Amino acid sequence: MFELAVKYIFSRKLQSLLMLIGVAFGCGGYIVFTSIQTGFQNFLKERLIENNGHITIRSREDYITPDSLAGVFFEGKRIYWITEPSGKRSHDYLQSAWYWQKLLEKLPYVVASTRRIEATTTCSRASFSRSISLRGVDPVNEPKVTNIAEDIIEGKLQMLSSGNNMVIAGVELLKFLGAKVNDTINIINPDGHVYPVKVVGIYSSGDRRNDESLVLGSITTVQNILESPGKITKIVVKTIDANKAAVFAQKLSQYSYDKVESWDQANVNFLSMTKQQSLIRQITMFTFILVVSFGIYNVLNMMVHQKQ
């Protein structure tokens, strides 16, 4: 049967050539479409991982419900609430940061970890002001976990250690404030206290949202601004395999009551979108194969009828 099909294909060279060109264009289009889609997905995943690490450890947030208070009042008794309790229990800062730091150094699946302190504050210069995301980082350990240092287009991350009032600001934020490197800007903490800081670098990630709001400082600098000495809000971890981050996060969650979350757990909606895109790609491939197969069958069928 195969020999017969080959014979008929080569007997009508022009038709076979046109069929081959059609198949080639179809295959090429599918390959380009798949490459663009897959490349875009991988790029977004890399950006998520590069900026936020594989695993994040932060203070746990618990919602208050009637079940969560079972046994607190009148243990063993059934309680009927006139107004059901609600709300949320949480800590602004990680209570066991140093414990985590020592533990992570001993685990074989942890490559590196770094501490952070983050808060939403306000930045101003002259009559201009804007809400910002203030992030205190460790200039030594941060590059081991994320690629944030590669997004600094002027200055270096290590310059944050040269003083207690040095910051690196997003390029769009500096444009809005009309500031540049070596200028002084003001950061207003949640209590309304103003702290002047010196811009020693410019950050540009290509993400306009970050570039308009992110301000980096050393951990000590940000602790001073927030008036929270020794406080840490999160620990970011890099593991030996980003694809197994959820498994490693599950293991880490057994060591403490703190919230341990992998990058894929924190971006469920994004991963759901990529799965839908992959499904669409598979359907497209199946449809393409079906159309090509039917086209080849029609060509061969026409050749057989012409021979008759």
Show which residues each predicted segment covers:
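Hydrophobic secondary-structure segments that place a key small or acidic residue at a functional site
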Residues: R116-A119, F128-D138, I153-T220
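Hydrophobic alpha-helical transmembrane segments of multi-pass inner-membrane transport and secretion
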Residues: K13-F40, K275-Q308
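Structural motif
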Residues: N52-I55, P108-V111, L177, G230, ...
